[in-house]
């Protein structure tokens, strides 16, 4: 990084009141700032008890000061942490004092971004920091920690090293174009390529599982009015999150709820119907429902077996994208017998369910996990993002194209290897555009 990088400061603990609050400062040559803050010169990695004072020497708070000298710190720069009492007024006064002494307020994710730019961690590890903070389940937290500790990165670095080795082998043959030799066969380049393809497939399979655990499944509930969509949402959520009455059309806006099934987040939207209406308020809810449908991975199509596919249900089915996966739910199974087979909703799975008694809920949850592609947490998994999966798919495609090259298409073979390496490098940040870095780190919390 440049020598002109400014000193930054921010509250590193969550907003609100707490027993302890932490101010984090990062920059170059921070000992004079520490001296001005508490009248002491701290030793590296030693907790120093001190009064934190304002410009007039009046105590703002008392607590612990920790100093981490560059480069042995989280950001790779000098880092100071002030651990004081966790009230918002005290934290605000301490932060303002740091700003008076020359620091500026840190942007979201700026501490982690500096750690990345100073080679303290790579991009996949940096994203692991945010994912650990945002983890919605124990499984997600465990897998995010693996990414933070470098499990995912080591897999990617291994792929890159193998790609570089194969590229060196292949590109060395380009120095001898006049030789009538099948270099790809002679150097066993194809055998090595097959091994690389298997390795990429393995990492991709793990990344897809990690992405499922991080990003979950988007589900919409659709069906005719008063068929039991809100009751099903409440049953899945285990709470009264939607109003349930005997009046058709009670739900006038899309109701959203997130649940966990075996640690996998499932984002459920109870739609406000998919029909035309003159009611302005209801029309807004219907537009939101249509948007939810367009973003969904699975639609739960609720059908009353006593009525089958009535005109309203058919109209709703016509509004669903053809490629959207569907699960047909025969609702209110406690009130009537389950109809054999489905009603032609386009669903491969039919489940009889009672939101009142809970019968069929476990079967539905298992089916949702299957539709998500979740295979269960296993050794070697790590938390991943959609961009990681897409990058690995790009590498997979380039290696597949390399395998199609003729025996003497060495230059084209080498180019596909290079592009596969670039795709893998995007994951760890070796080849990453600045605008992508800005997007990634802007989603962090301030102080991290």
Swiss-Prot record:
Q: Which residues bind Mg(2+)?
A: 230, 251
* Origin species: Neisseria meningitidis serogroup A / serotype 4A (strain DSM 15465 / Z2491)
Task: Read off the CDD domains from this record.
Answer: trmE, TrmE_N
Q: Where does (6S)-5-formyl-5,6,7,8-tetrahydrofolate bind?
A: 24, 81, 120, 448
- UniProt keyword Magnesium, yes or no: yes
What positions does the entry give for K(+) binding?
A: 226, 245, 247, 250
Subunit field text:
Homodimer. Heterotetramer of two MnmE and two MnmG subunits.
Q: Name one GO cellular component term.
A: cytosol
Query: Localized where?
Result: Cytoplasm
Record-annotated TrmE-type G domain positions: 216-373
tRNA processing as a keyword of this entry, yes or no, is: yes
User: What Pfam families does the record tag this protein with?
Assistant: MMR_HSR1 (PF01926), MnmE_helical (PF12631), TrmE_N (PF10396)
> What are the required cofactors?
K(+)
**Which protein is depicted?**
tRNA modification GTPase MnmE
Known InterPro entries for this protein? G_TrmE, GTP-bd, GTP-bd_TrmE_N, GTPase_MnmE, MnmE_dom2, MnmE_helical, P-loop_NTPase, Small_GTP-bd
- What does the cofactor section's free text say about binding? Binds 1 potassium ion per subunit.
Traced from the root, the source organism's taxonomic lineage reads: Bacteria, Pseudomonadati, Pseudomonadota, Betaproteobacteria, Neisseriales
